[in-house]
Amino acid sequence: MAQTAYLKVTRIAMRSASNLSKRRVEELNSGLGELRQLLSCVVCCQLLVDPYSPKGKRCQHNVCRLCLRGKKHLFPSCTQCEGCSDFKTYEENRMMAAQLLCYKTLCVHLLHSALFGELAGMRPQVARELVPRIKLPPKTTQEFIREGSNISDTFDIFLPQPDLPFLKDMPTSLPAETPPTSAVTTPELPYDHHLNISDIEAEAAATAEQGHFSPLPLLPTGSRMGMLSHAGQIVIATESSESGFMDQAWTDQVDLSGTVSVSKYTNSGNNFAVSYVMPTSATTKFDPQELQIGQVVQMADSTQLAVLAAVEETVETSTQLTVLSTTVEETVETSTQLEVLTSAEEPNEISDQLANLQVEESDEALVEETVEEAEGTSIPSEVVAEHMEEDQHLDVHTSQSPTQTEMEEAVEEHVATKTQLGHVQTELQDAESLQKDFEDAKAAAEEAKEKEKDLHAISAELQKEDSDEPTLKRKRTRTLKASQAAKIEPVPSEVKTKVQSGKGALRRIRGKDKEEKVKPPKPKCRCGISGSSNTLTTCRNSRCPCYKSYNSCAGCHCVCCKNPHKEDYVESDEDDDLEDFEMPKDVPEPMTQSEEPVVAEPRQEENSMAPPDSSAPISLVPLNNLQQSQHPLVLVQNEKGEYQGFNIFQGSKPLDPVTVGFTIRVQLQHTDGFGSLPQYAYIMPTIDPPNPPAPSLSPPPPPAPDREVIEPPAKKFRTSRTRRGRANFSALDTVDELVSGGSRSNSAAGDRSSATDNAHSLFEEIMSGSDDL
């Protein structure tokens, strides 16, 4: 249906507006409205975007991809696609997408044709049918044409774009597309083709009746498909705006004998040409009789282009010459300025140059830069001598200057040079003083190094003596070491006071002072790399310095470290200074266990405090974060089987878990390399529940009184009371007696008058017994 409506509208749109009757214009108006309905979404009533159609339906009620689940505005409602509302019932319709591109091209053609003016003020009149359709928005036909020409064409997004810069500004078109033509601009074909224009087409081109003979493309002008593969024709339109309203067609003839074909795109590889109407007063070298409408001219033979190119070259060369001349003049000026400044034999030129420098600010900046480059980073004595000679020449020749202004300027320059020399001399003196201070500081640093070497030798001897002694002797040697360091401390302070005047030397001395404060390195653990046959036992013999000093192994290379000492007496170098002032009075002796020798070694902070009171109760303090534990860690298992961290205290003093009896110790794994989790933790042994007390010999308690349970009386059934046990009744032995009324004779029921009485009495007996149930 949409293709049929498109073909009907296209046949009318390809005709000339001057030959169309009013009825044809109305048909075009109604056809555009019908085509707009068929190409619209039945949900949003706009032109389709990514059209989808119902599967297996022929109603052709298309929707946009984003409107699949929306409410359809069809009047009347469609019974075929009423239940279609998801991607399972809709499928993509690419034919409708191509139809939309054709509709866009049609609207672009109508927008630039004379038919657009004929449709001014008209609204599309759609015939009322019983077919379900949408209602068009309240717009005019011209507004619908503008809407169709502005359809966003997304099909050429992923196509290759032209790489050359001049192709980006070219109007995009397809090889088969023919743009609107006019008397001023006519399209041309490539050079190897010739355009055959009939008389009707020439008349239409001259009277501005464009396009009724040209084929209409199937893709819009915005598409760039095939741009690089095919050398398409260049389209040049007079204006991109829509054509206005015209009361009647333009029938005036235009003289096209003076047209000149000039290349539009000189950078392109193809020799395209466009015909322009030149004014009669224009002087051209072309013969007007030789050129016709649409004639192709090869631009390689054109002389005007050569003239233009030559003019451009001359202009470029002239600008280059001017630039070169200015640069040469500037270089000459700078060179003359440098020569004047460096030569001391021409003082008159120096004074003239100084006068010019004060007038021209740009030249003054250049001179300052050249002077700074000439001086360099260091100022030798030869430069100072040259400045002195220049000062002498200035003093001699200032009287010879012809004008008073030059004399004053020379005097000012002389004063400036003197001040510069004074600054240079002061800087040299400062440098000499800094060098002297640096030499003094260097000598002091060497003396400090020698003393430090002596200190290293003394500490090594003390460590050898301390190898077989207990922990207390080790601490005494540290006090001696600290006293030796205290004696040497005043030396770098004196060095600092000497070198406060210098700048760079002071920084070097400060760095050396820090190096002097560094204490000698502790002996490294060589466990695992000592070359012994059994590397698993090297951590527990006398060859391990860490084991001998009752410390944990530092940098151990063993397969499995067997050193039982997992805590150091002194954790950092700062604790050595604290030991000199705070010595513990009582040091607890280490406790040994049968399973594994574990030494309880309290930290320096615990040693500095008084021993805990033995009478104080022992308490466990829970920890929220195990990494914040500053004391030995104790793990206690709760009722859920989970372990929780605690610190053990006696009063306010921390305790070592070994002293309490916690002998089970586990190694903790560090999942985070930046944490401070303790290496080992002690597990609190599980406390067995107390045994039940033994039974006492006291008499057993009296038994509990029995509770009387009141139960409802059992259902009593009436016992079978024989008739013999009752008065005036005899037992009925057989059924015959019951039927015969109690007679023992074999007689039928009703033979005697007392049969009914007996039956009544029996019934009353049965009913009276039901009261006892």
From Swiss-Prot:
Residue ranges of the region described as Disordered: 460-525, 572-616, 687-773
Query: Which residue stretches does the UniProt record annotate as biased composition, category Polar residues?
Result: 742-759
Q: What class of enzyme is it?
A: transferase
Please give the annotated consequence of changing residue 639 to A: Impaired interaction with Clamp
Up-regulation conditions: Msl-2 protein is only present in males: production is prevented by Sxl protein in females, which controls splicing and prevents translation of msl-2 transcripts.
Pathways per UniProt: Protein modification; protein ubiquitination
Q: Where is this region: Clamp-binding domain (CBD)?
A: 620-685
The alphabetical list of record keywords is:
Chromosome, Coiled coil, DNA-binding, Metal-binding, Nucleus, RNA-binding, Transferase, Ubl conjugation, Ubl conjugation pathway, Zinc, Zinc-finger
Show the ranges annotated as biased composition (Acidic residues).
572-581
Q: How is it modified after translation?
A: Autoubiquitinated.
**UniProt subunit comment:** Component of the male-specific lethal (MSL) histone acetyltransferase complex, composed of mof, mle, msl-1, msl-2 and msl-3 proteins, as well as roX1 and roX2 non-coding RNAs. When not associated with chromatin, the MSL complex associates with msl-2 mRNAs, possibly to regulate the amount of available MSL complex. Interacts with Clamp; promoting cooperative binding to DNA PionX sites and recruitment of the MSL complex to chromatin.
Which protein is depicted? Answer: E3 ubiquitin-protein ligase msl-2
What species does this protein belong to? Drosophila melanogaster (Fruit fly)
Q: What's the gene?
A: msl-2
